[in-house]
Amino acid sequence: MGGSGGRAGLTPGFAEDAAAGAGRAFTARTAPGIVARPMEAVLLIGLQASGKSTFCREQFFDTHVRLHPRLLGTRERERLLLDACLAARVPFVVDDTNVTRLERAYYIGPARSAGFRVVRYFFRSRLHEALEHNRRRRASERVSEDEIRATSARIELPKLSEGFEELHFVVSHHDDSFRVEPWRD
């Protein structure tokens, strides 16, 4: 039980707060402490070492579930988490390169079918900048230069017609700050 004075597993005051709300119906808009979030799928697009993960942490850490292949280990786990986000109507961000239309379609189709708004952030992907940023990373975070070059060769610029509701262009600076601009075709 510990010295909390409450039941095991509950934080002090939780039972009292729950009892105070007993019998009252809450919605996402009226429940205390709950903020309604739009059903939103965010795709980050760009070379490795272009700033996507840093931007993701700064912009979406508190609001979206992060889908990242290195974090999850396998595409099967990623698909399970994606399906869970869609079923639970939870906003998510795909923190991966997503450089081809086919790679993006894997997320866009299911998200739109589930009623999600799809937003895209394309990171300026200059090969020499990504290689330099990669060299400055901690050894455990570095990607092989060959992998970055191969990704650069596959980039297909995204288009609104792919199913995005919003398109943004992101410039990453050496101090890990970002400038977000409207997309211009």
Predicted segments, located by residue:
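Pre-Walker A adenine-sensing motif
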Residues: 26-34
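Glycine-rich phosphate-binding P-loop
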Residues: 43-57
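Conserved phosphate-donor/acceptor-positioning beta-strand/loop module used by diverse small-molecule
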Residues: 116-130
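Compositionally biased, low-complexity flexible segments
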Residues: 1-25
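Conserved GTP-binding G-domain of TRAFAC-class P-loop NTPases and closely related GTPase folds
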Residues: 38-41, 129-185
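Conserved substrate/cofactor phosphate-moiety recognition/catalytic segment
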Residues: 53-103
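Catalytic phosphate/metal-binding cores of nucleic-acid and nucleotide-processing enzymes, i.e., regions
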Residues: 36-41, 57-58, 69, 88, ...
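Conserved beta-strand scaffold positions in the cores of enzyme catalytic domains, especially
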Residues: 64-66, 118-120, 166-169
